[in-house]
Regions:
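Short helix-to-turn junction characteristic of helix-turn-helix DNA-binding domains
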Residues: 93, 148, 250, 298-302
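C-terminal accessory regions
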Residues: 239-267
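Helicase motor core with emphasis on the C-terminal RecA-like subdomain
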Residues: 1-230, 241, 266-270, 277
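Pre-recognition alpha-helix immediately N-terminal to the DNA-recognition helix
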Residues: 25, 88, 245, 293-296
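Accessory DNA-binding and partner-docking regions appended to nucleic-acid-acting proteins
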Residues: 213, 224-228, 238-239, 258, ...
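Catalytic cores of large soluble enzymes that bind and process phosphate-bearing ligands
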Residues: 42-46, 81, 136, 234-238, ...
Length: 342
């Protein structure tokens, strides 16, 4: 397009998806973007829903929208559920030689407290570590960030406050020490390991309390305090749904890359060969008998018992609780006494 008398302004607003990902009030978002006066917006990780939200906020008429591929083929994805997460982390770093090599990596933690603890412990292990979170002074954050970018420190331990605008090409791994609250955040942060196109690893350590912590953040919703009550409710429901999708990612036995790409609306192969699930052989087991027995056992109970109690019933347990509450009279008692129920 050639316009002799018209100046075309092209500015990329970094991560437009943040408009809705963080619950920014619509009017505030419109005012902010209007002040920028840009004619070109860009975002790296937006679902179809978020793209529609962005177009609505900008009030664009007949906009040209181009969606490129989300796949980052050089990234290896893995989800692990270690019993001792810190021990697993140290073992990984030493196995890969990050205690002696000059390669860089990022470890994301959910809270400032975790950042402080992990960075302190790794430093004591002899790793070249720095840290970043909103609780540090501006001066210290700037110094720590520059030490990481320019190679004075190899490992950055940080909350999600770190990363905006960072384009360090030689990041070889991104480890999520805790599960983030949504797939958008996860993929954005994991993508900081792919900038030079070389093979890199993205590992997520899952533990159940991550779900509770994220739910607490969502329930509190301090960043949504400017919204009216009805909008806050909508935002909270949306955020809880995204948390659920993030949790599903941690438990799927399917290709992790396929799960990610499908989440962002992109079709992909069911086998990528470059994620832990694709490199793991899952055995297909028929558990119809076990499932039906447990369901019938639950139907026969007149009270809500925990999973451990139900397992004891179908296994034929003889504990004081089972016998004292006459749970041995359940029609499914001991039906699975010879079977293993996880």
């Amino acid at each position: 397009m050639h316009c002799a008398h018209e100046r075309i302004c092209r500015r990329a607003t970094y991560l437009c998806r943040g408009i809705f990902a963080y619950g920014t009030p619509v009017q505030t978002a419109r005012q902010t973007l209007a002040q920028i006066g840009a004619s070109w917006r860009a975002t790296a990780t937006a679902t179809a829903e978020v793209r529609e939200d962005i177009l609505d906020i900008l009030r664009l008429q007949n906009p040209y929208v181009e969606t490129t591929g989300f796949d980052r083929g050089n990234l290896f994805f893995a989800v692990k559920k270690p019993v001792d997460k810190y021990k697993e982390l140290v073992s990984y770093l030493k196995e890969k030689g990050y205690d002696t090599s000059g390669d860089s990596g990022i470890i994301y933690c959910l809270t400032r407290k975790s950042v402080e603890q992990v960075s302190f412990d790794l430093r004591n292990e002899g790793f070249s570590v720095t840290r970043y979170h909103a609780g540090l002074s501006d001066e210290e954050r700037k110094e720590n960030q520059e030490n990481f970018i320019y190679g004075k420190r190899q490992i950055m331990v940080a909350t999600n406050a770190f990363g905006m605008g960072i384009d360090k090409p030689d990041v070889r791994f991104v480890i999520h020490y805790n599960m983030p609250k949504n797939m958008e955040s996860y993929y954005q942060e994991a993508g900081r390991a792919w900038r030079d196109g070389e093979p890199s690893e993205c590992i997520l350590y899952y533990e159940p309390k991550d779900v509770r912590t994220n739910r607490l953040f969502i329930e509190n919703g301090e960043e949504n305090s400017e919204l009216d009550e009805e909008t806050r409710k909508i935002v909270k429901e949306r955020d809880l749904e995204r948390l659920k999708q993030m949790t599903f990612y941690c438990f799927t036995s399917e290709c992790l890359r396929q799960y990610i790409l499908n989440y962002f609306g992109e079709k992909s192969s069911s086998y990528c060969g470059n994620c832990l699930n694709c490199q793991t052989q899952f055995e297909e087991v028929d558990i119809t008998l076990e499932a039906n027995t447990i369901l019938r056992c639950l139907d026969a109970l007149d009270w809500n018992y925990g999973a451990a109690t139900v397992i004891d019933i179908v296994h034929g347990g003889k504990s004081q609780k089972i016998l004292g509450k006459n749970l041995d009279k359940n029609p499914e008692y001991a039906v699975l006494s010879e079977r293993t129920v996880p």
